[in-house]
């Protein structure tokens, strides 16, 4: 939840979810 993954998730889910990133406030974050 604190480290930005450099990916937005406004229109599509986080592709980076495979490495533990999750959508928060339209941006993908890790932890």
From Swiss-Prot:
One of its GO terms (biological process) is defense response. Belongs to the cyclotide family. Bracelet subfamily. There is a cross-link at residues 1-31 (Cyclopeptide (Gly-Asn)). Keywords: Disulfide bond, Plant defense. Disulfide bonds join 5-21, 9-23, 14-28. This is Cyclotide mden-J. Probably participates in a plant defense mechanism. Pfam families: Cyclotide. The presence of a 'disulfide through disulfide knot' structurally defines this protein as a knottin. It comes from the Eukaryota. This is a cyclic peptide. InterPro entries: Cyclotide, Cyclotide_bracelet_CS, Cyclotide_sf.
């Amino acid at each position: 939840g604190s480290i930005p993954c450099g990916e937005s998730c406004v229109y599509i889910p986080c592709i980076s979810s495979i490495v533990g990133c999750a959508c928060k406030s339209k941006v993908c974050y890790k932890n």
